């Protein structure tokens, strides 16, 4: 990881963006309403200047050692609210982490969900590290991608655990359009074969 303090100049831009694309979204009258977030927000939001990369080279959406009562925002120093990719990466992380938090407040049937892909989850990113070798931009780890799609998942993060898988479903519905999600589901109809494209 490249964890160091964020540049103060970017903190306000990040906060304004997450207010508009997270808080305002969930409190919109047609969704949760103005009281929806009461008692549901993370207790703390931590910001870091650099990326959150694990020992295998994969950039992560969250802090593996933290509780869901805390939200961790990375790459603040590179954030630019005019850059669609930077906003996309930030909001994928925010929506993923908040979905995990909501999963603890509104329990889902984990056993039933686990039965869908029980033997397909991976314990470590080591087996997919080859995909991220030389990756410098980060976005690749956060997108809908053929490799996980063909294994029955939306993203690389979905492969890591049932909780991440469930959170990814929510995060993706908030950051992608229906057409993109349908294309991923269509790719999932063709199982992955070693040696095929990523």
Where does each model-flagged region fall?
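Non-catalytic architectural context of zinc metalloproteases
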Residues: 1-13
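Solvent-exposed, polar/charged alpha-helical surfaces in well-ordered, non-transmembrane soluble domains
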Residues: 12, 16-20, 92, 96, ...
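Auxiliary, metal-adjacent structural segments of Zn-dependent hydrolase domains
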Residues: 12-70
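A generic secondary-structure signal for well-formed alpha-helical elements
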Residues: 22-29, 102-106, 174, 178
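Structural recognition of the beta-strand scaffold that forms the well-ordered cores
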Residues: 44-47, 70-74, 166-173
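Active-site scaffold of zinc-dependent metalloenzymes
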Residues: 48-95, 104
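Catalytic Zn2+-binding segment of zinc metalloproteases
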Residues: 97-115
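Metalloprotease/metallohydrolase-associated module, dominated by Zn2+-dependent proteases
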Residues: 122-197
